[in-house]
Amino acid sequence: NPPAVARIKYQAFYAAEKISQVDTPKTKKESWMDRLAGTQPADENAKPLFQLGEPYGMAVDSKGNLYVADQKVGAIFVFNTATREVELIKNKVHGHFVRIIGLAMDDNDRLFVSDPGLRHVLTFNAKHEPEDVITEGLVSPGGLALDVENRLLYVADIDQDQVLVYEADSLKLLRRIGTTGQNHALTTPGDFARPAGIAVDADGNLYVADTLNNRIEIFDGDGKFIRTFGKAGDGPGYFSRPKGVAIDSDDHIWVVDGMQDRVQVFNQDAQLLISFGGHGLLPGMFQGIAGITIDKTNRVFTSEIFPGRVQQFLYVTDAQADQLNKEKEAAREKKAGASNKDSSPAVPPSPLTQASAPTPK
């Protein structure tokens, strides 16, 4: 049989080592001594280089552009994944940032940005212009997720051990999930100890990476607890500080395991399907993995703090894999049939054929 189709394919990485986005103030004309000493740039219009420092939360807009929140640089990188061009949503230019962590994008390309340093969530329109600020109920907002169909914004509050639910248009606080005030000590199902990444599936169910409890908790769209899975450990299917969670179009649950620098993929029955990663800088390995997001085309993006990079993978869906396997099998059978035909011995003519053949003159 032909080998099965690879279900997760590495595609690219983003680091922006040579991106230049911020103008430097013009200085006096440099002398030959300045050039020799290296005290001034050779070009008055030269700009400093920027690269990802500590990328965390990510989001993808309707055009396929990738947004990456960088808490060290204090900016949001906007990568055109087709042309590899980069823009920045900058601190003190487009908005005021202290420590940006979480990102989420709605169907109108409105961007939500969590900043625990300022205890709020900012919103930007599609032109990257600031619009609104959410402060109600927030102490240390981190992970963000949007239920676009039901118009709900979920905000994981790390210090309060809660997930806050807002109406996505009016930005009104609707309810809280979890118990607060216990200093990250609660282990009961439905409560959290430093919740980090969150995600919403197609049915409106909420998934929460409960970091200190080393588990994933699942709630329905009304905030009612459904189930939990995961235990502390470093073996397959176990967690060591899960930080991020995402859902693909087949409803598989992708979990970023912080201390193990790996990604584990589960089905809805919490059965482990695949695990990949490990400590390292090679493609498909991670150093300080922090976040994960999956877009509508099943591109998977992971962020890493220590090398300052984002890696891009492609998840091949169940339907796509079935079709590709059928095509592979058909090609194999066609090749085998042609091979058998070429290798079959020549059939001698029958006596009837010999008798009816014209006699050469």
Predicted regions and their residues:
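Eukaryotic scaffold repeat domains enriched in small/polar residues
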Residues: 1-361
